Design a protein with these regions (language model features):
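Catalytic or ion-translocation cores adjacent to nucleophile or general acid/base/metal-coordination motifs
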Residues: 247, 256, 260-276, 285-339, ...
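Helical scaffold of the NTase/Pol beta-like nucleotidyltransferase catalytic core
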Residues: 205-207, 237-264
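Glycine-rich, often proline-containing surface loops adjacent to acidic residues and nearby aromatics
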Residues: 227-235, 314-321
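Terminal catalytic/cofactor-binding subdomain
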Residues: 127-233
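A glycine-rich phosphate-binding loop feature that marks nucleotide/adenosyl-phosphate handling sites
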Residues: 352-361
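Conserved small/polar residues in nucleotide/adenosyl-binding loops
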Residues: 362-369
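Extreme N-terminal flexible tails
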Residues: 1-170
Length: 373
């Protein structure tokens, strides 16, 4: 019965902290309106009150089933154009939006927790992003993950299976749909709260946190398709193309100064080998330590004029140079020197060319804050 599912989802919101006790009636009424219902029957409410209360764990486990039954009802009642994965995802995001705090409330709480510690702030925001179903826990569980021991360390291997397959009806509808440039891409700030359409995912349950990076406005969010713990995305407030340059190193280091428990990195600014959304300047990070970060330095290096910076070639199957210093300005200067040298480097005997038919050598910088032992 849909009324019982409405009570279940409201309890889910209360248990996870998305809904305050004072907002219980309000949330129930919003859900009734969404499903074109005029009332909550007294008998249903009385019977539900006798049930065993949810816990955080049982609430998480129940969410997928609650939403599926709500979606089945919506499909039968004609509240969705088609009963397909695409339309179900659009509608269940709308359902969850009834529980999600306003952006101003999320930002205010994040900033208050940040004053206690950056980790408390990100812990809150990561939990929120999962509880709102922006990160779909039940789909993430489908991902295949394992480790492999190699001479370079224990590597993480992931096959992402959480992205839903496009259904034929949605593909056909997307071709016929009016083309829109709003939002300009999947990263733009305008996605926050957006209802979506057949060719763009719904984001009513999506929240972003403003951060200042290198004296400019950026935003912080989590990836809906989590590849590792607290997989986050840091993106420019403006829809501007990715570009690896000297300023990039300053931006990356600025972020890890603000969130020292996170790493952050930039994909290359080239197609195929680089980021999947090159049209919007962004970085990716998280609360995780990959094998490359643990790999030892197999050969120490000294750069002229940078004798105060520790440097070395990392034991890794690809070319990796690790540099460290107490002053970030020194790291920025040396990183830029290495970048410029690499982009102009050619070794024909090793089949390395600075440029071939317009394709350039690429680099992927990734800093983290490490305390010296």
């Amino acid at each position: 019965m849909i009324q019982e599912r409405i009570l279940e989802l409201t309890e889910y919101g209360l248990v996870t902290g998305l809904v305050e006790p004072e907002d219980r009636r309000f949330t129930i009424n919003r859900l009734l309106e969404l499903f074109h219902l005029d009332e909550l029957e007294d008998e249903v409410a009385a019977a539900y009150a006798k049930r065993t209360p949810m816990t955080q764990e049982s609430a998480e486990a129940a969410l997928e089933g609650i939403l599926n039954e709500m979606l089945d009802y919506a499909a039968e009642d004609g509240l969705m154009p088609e009963d397909t994965i695409t339309y179900r995802d659009l509608f269940d995001t709308k359902i969850m939006s009834m529980l999600v705090p306003r952006p101003s409330e999320v930002i205010k709480k994040f900033q208050a927790l940040y004053q206690i510690s950056p980790k408390e702030a990100t812990d809150y925001f990561y939990k929120l992003s999962r509880d709102t179903n922006y990160i779909r826990r039940y789909r993430i569980k489908k991902d295949q993950k394992w480790t492999a021991d190699t001479e370079f360390g224990t590597l993480d291997i992931t096959i992402n299976l959480s992205k839903p397959e496009k259904d034929p009806k949605a593909i056909a509808a997307a071709k016929l749909a009016k083309q829109s440039g709003y939002p300009k891409c999947l990263l733009c700030k305008e996605n926050e709260g957006y209802a979506g359409r057949v060719n763009h995912p719904a984001r009513q349950n999506h929240r972003i946190i403003p951060v200042t990076i290198n004296h400019s406005d950026w935003f912080f969010q989590y990836s809906p398709y989590v590849y590792y713990n607290e997989h986050c995305i840091v993106f420019n407030a403006e829809h501007t193309p990715m570009k690896i340059e000297k300023a990039t190193f300053g931006k990356l280091l600025d972020f890890v100064e603000q969130f020292p428990h996170y790493f952050v990195g930039s994909n290359a600014d080239l197609p195929i080998v680089g980021g999947s959304i090159l049209s919007h300047d962004h970085f990716q990070g998280g609360h995780y330590e990959f094998a490359m970060a643990k790999a030892p330095v197999e050969k120490e290096l000294t750069f002229k004029g940078f004798e105060d910076v520790k440097a070395g070639i990392v034991k890794w199957p690809m070319s990796v140079i690790r540099i460290s210093a107490p002053q970030k300005e020194r790291l920025i200067e040396l990183a830029d020197k290495i970048l410029l040298a690499w982009r102009g480097y050619t070794d024909e005997d090793a089949f390395i060319f600075a440029e071939t038919e317009g394709c350039l050598l690429y680099t992927s910088p990734s800093p983290r804050d490490v305390e010296e032992s």
